[in-house]
Regions:
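Conserved, hydrophobic alpha-helical core segments of structured domains
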Residues: 1-145
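Charged substrate- and nucleic-acid-binding regions of tRNA-handling and nucleotidyl-transfer enzymes
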Residues: 79-83, 137-188
Length: 188
């Protein structure tokens, strides 16, 4: 039998795309290798592109596209991880990273704080590691500048965390009760 049948369609799925030099399975294997030595992050990489074969389209110029594959990959991963009896904590860490692995993290404070609000500190750091591993397993001639940008993004993220900036309402040093005590009132 096959332990992870969700991977089988990736074996024979080429990626005719300037960003990729490997078929889907080879890309997955190389991204697992490029990921930090953390079981959950390596599982993210194992499943992050499993939805590509089901989403593959080829445009009139012969370029392959995989629109919507993060959502399909997340669904496949959820099914596989449940079958493999992954812990609830692992699934709560892994699935959002698969869902957002193609999301854009810009090297600016507003973008980083948006991701911090969505995924928290650990999740945002994990997402940068996932994106770095993903890019490292693509066409490095094209992706190396993006990898370097992710290093800068991670450095800026660490600065934001060291400063103790608020990135969600719960992080503010003052709340509604304090504002009311100071005399602030809402709309009459």
């Amino acid at each position: 039998g096959v332990v992870v049948p969700e991977l089988v369609p990736a074996f024979d799925c080429p990626q005719q795309n300037p960003w990729h030099v490997y078929d889907v399975f080879t890309h997955i294997a190389r991204s697992v290798e490029a990921a930090p030595k953390d079981a959950d992050l390596r599982l993210v990489m194992l499943f992050h592109d499993t939805g590509k074969p089901a989403c593959k389209t080829t445009d009139e110029e012969g370029i392959d596209h995989f629109y919507g594959h993060p959502t399909v990959s997340e669904q496949l991963a959820k099914s596989a991880l449940e079958r493999l009896k992954a812990s609830r904590a692992s699934m709560q860490r892994i699935l959002p990273l698969i869902r957002y692995h193609d999301g854009h993290i810009l090297t600016d404070e507003k973008s980083i704080k948006r991701w911090l609000n969505r995924l928290g500190q650990a999740g945002t750091l994990d997402l940068i590691d996932v994106k770095t591993a993903d890019l490292a397993a693509q066409n490095l001639a094209r992706t190396q500048p993006e990898i370097e940008e992710l290093y800068r993004t991670k450095a800026l993220l660490r600065q934001i965390l060291e400063r103790g900036d608020a990135f969600a309402l719960r992080d503010l040093a003052i709340g509604g009760e304090e504002l009311l005590a100071l005399g602030y009132r809402g709309k009459a």
